Amino acid sequence: MNREPLFITSHESRGTIKGDREYMTRIAVDAMGGDHAPFEIVAGAVWAAAEYGVALELVGKQDRIEQCLEVIQQEGFMSPCGKAGKARRVRVDVKALDIKITHASEIIEMGEAPGQAIRKKKNSSIVLTVNSVATGSSDALVAAGSTGAAMASSLFGLGRIQGIDRPAIAVTLPTMKKPIVVIDGGANSNCTPQMLKQFAAMGRIFSKNVLGVDNPRVGVLNIGEEAGKGNELAQQTYTLLEDEKEKFNFMGNVEGRELFLNVCDVVVCDGFVGNVVLKVTEGTASLLLKMIKSEFKSDILGMIIGTLAKPFMKRIHEKINYEEFGGMLLLGVKGITVISHGRSKAYAIKNAVRVAKEAVETCINKKIAESIA
């Protein structure tokens, strides 16, 4: 399955034209990470390559990746597609795609300590995936395995953007209107006010360039709206952002109950709080959908109403389904890292590759560096 790439691979030639063909963005994918690896990961990656016109570097056990590609070429794969969410068979002509396979002899498991694991397993799939971006072989990476390993590998392998103390995870959450960004989503449990100020700057760039929000509004997640509310971190962060209110389009404190009411576009908090928000949101959304479905099945009237409401339920599911967002960008490192949910299947991986491609094309790291300078 390895073959000569169709497009130029020089890192210095990104965005140039060879002959009459423009360079194709290459995304490195950790094929061995996640609960459904490698088949669902490979399937989502090739699906994205076919739909979004990207080249791929699939990193992992070469024989298993090749087996996946062969099955996909011959049989396709089942996946929910489009707004209806109905599962259908997806067909992809794998042979027509620009795919490079990099063999990785090791895998970092979910329970391993990230820092120790990446030092011990230098030939692991996530380490080699990061190395592909670090050396310029690929433009961005997608990983659905250990979040800690993906973050640690990216931090040590790619390095931090100058002026950024710590990278942060940008989490996209749905609201009644447009999506919002919660940052940090879990990279840093202990933060300083200066770090949260940097998160605000990075979150604004993400919101503007990836989500298309003009002049994103920033808020500090807190237990009350007043300036003196919250712990020392929240109060000092409030002061820093208030001092540069126009630059950050700072709206003040945001309470948890206001999170999904579009009072701001970027919500800053430490990674401990942000990750709890993410997990509670996922759990609540899942619970509500299950409760509604259960009520629809409770009696004949419920079944009738449920049948009539099915199109509306599908649209709601689409808005709150994590698979639609694909993955979370790790902002602040010298490279594009998209971290997907460990439960991700093909559709989520396809969208994660799309997020990676958009981040490359919008030059998000360059804009972060310029904003911090």
Regions found by a protein language model. Give the residues of each.
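Short Gly/Ser/Thr- and charged-rich N-terminal loops/segments
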Residues: 14, 82-90
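Short glycine/serine/threonine-rich phosphate/pyrophosphate-binding segments
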Residues: 37-41, 122-136, 140-154, 161, ...
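Glycine-rich phosphate/nucleotide-binding loop
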Residues: 155-168, 172-182, 263-267, 271-373
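Compositionally biased, intrinsically disordered low-complexity segments enriched in Pro/Arg/Gln/His
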Residues: 3-6, 11-14
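N-terminal phosphate-binding or glycine-rich loops at protein starts, especially the Walker A/P-loop
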Residues: 19-67
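Phosphate/nucleotide-donor binding subsite
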Residues: 75, 90-138
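Short, glycine-rich nucleotide/cofactor-binding loops
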Residues: 27-39, 118, 187-197, 339-346
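Glycine-rich phosphate/diphosphate-binding loop of Rossmann-like nucleotide-binding domains
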Residues: 39-40, 55-57, 189-256, 270
